[in-house]
Amino acid sequence: MLSPKRVKFRKQQRGRMRGVATRGNTIAFGEFALQAQECGWITSRQIEASRRAMTRYVKRGGKIWIRIFPDKPVTMRPAETRMGSGKGNPEFWVAVIKPGRILFEMGGEEITEEIAREAMRLAQYKLPIKTKFIGLDDQEKVAGSDKPASVPAITAES
């Protein structure tokens, strides 16, 4: 399972998840991707379960890229412990996900859209957030819509 080799601080505050992903929201390596539709935490175990589901389905057909990394420690107190006496110990690691973030990418010569869609669907079931399957052509359509509407030229009337 994924976790950082070493961190500067062992414990973090939980934080807030506001806004949309400004980084990691475009397809960079493959042709197909799984994009987050809502915010949440994804644990290293959930990432590994999704990766295994996709890998088993595509077998040796293509390549899978994991675009998220669990770098936030979540602490827990032991069961039936009284209040006080400090913060608990780190129990597991999570990746903080915002809407629009690309979670997984898939590509290769033998990967068709149908195979990629089914593999991503199997991965979706392992995740606690809503996700959407996108391809490179879908991304280009979205990127093209960001252009400002053409402004009519101003002519000087005399």
Swiss-Prot record:
- What does the entry list under GO cellular component? ribonucleoprotein complex; ribosome
NCBIfam families recorded: rplP_bact
Name the family. Answer: Belongs to the universal ribosomal protein uL16 family.
Q: What is this protein called?
A: Large ribosomal subunit protein uL16
How this chain assembles, per its entry, is: Part of the 50S ribosomal subunit.
Keywords (A to Z) from UniProt: Ribonucleoprotein, Ribosomal protein, RNA-binding, rRNA-binding, tRNA-binding
Q: Which gene encodes it?
A: rplP
- What HAMAP family would the database entry show? Ribosomal_uL16 (MF_01342)
Q: Which organism is it from?
A: Prochlorococcus marinus (strain MIT 9303)
> Which InterPro entries does the protein's record reference?
Ribosomal_uL16 (IPR047873), Ribosomal_uL16_bact-type (IPR000114), Ribosomal_uL16_CS (IPR020798), Ribosomal_uL16_dom (IPR016180), Ribosomal_uL16_sf (IPR036920)
Q: Name one GO biological process term.
A: translation
- Give the molecular function GO annotations: rRNA binding; structural constituent of ribosome; tRNA binding
